[in-house]
């Protein structure tokens, strides 16, 4: 409920102000009837972003098994490039299209509450990828990312809605 969330936020803020680091479990929450429930896949990321929003943190750092967001899955395409930054909206689109680094619900929270996220590796040093509302247009690539799922390749183009390659091929076949 709101009162529990508000009270928890106050406790977290006070602990941080006192230079204490609160250890908070993720992956669980309270449903509409007050029962504790699991949040499902990506629930820990969703928890982290929700807490960052509630305490008005300047950024939420997500440590994971990869060192950032790539232009496509580096396990499939070894030449994939790591992005220094990506917009929240673009990452939300990529997550919705099957990219597995960040879950859709976490990105929805980040977008709604304007929480910047830095995706970092748990295993090696590096700057990771910054996910923010806006990126300087000078740094913005035309193609941000490519997600692959169920034999479909989906592109995210700057300023253009997501279009799948299979859709483009089907349209091209219709014309011929």
Kindly label every feature range from the protein language model:
Residues 6-107:
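Nucleotide/pyrophosphate-binding catalytic subdomain
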Residues 9-10, 61-67, 123-131, 161-165:
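Short, mixed-charge, low-aromatic patches
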Residues 128-175:
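A conserved regulatory-domain signal marking ACT and ACT-like small-molecule sensing domains
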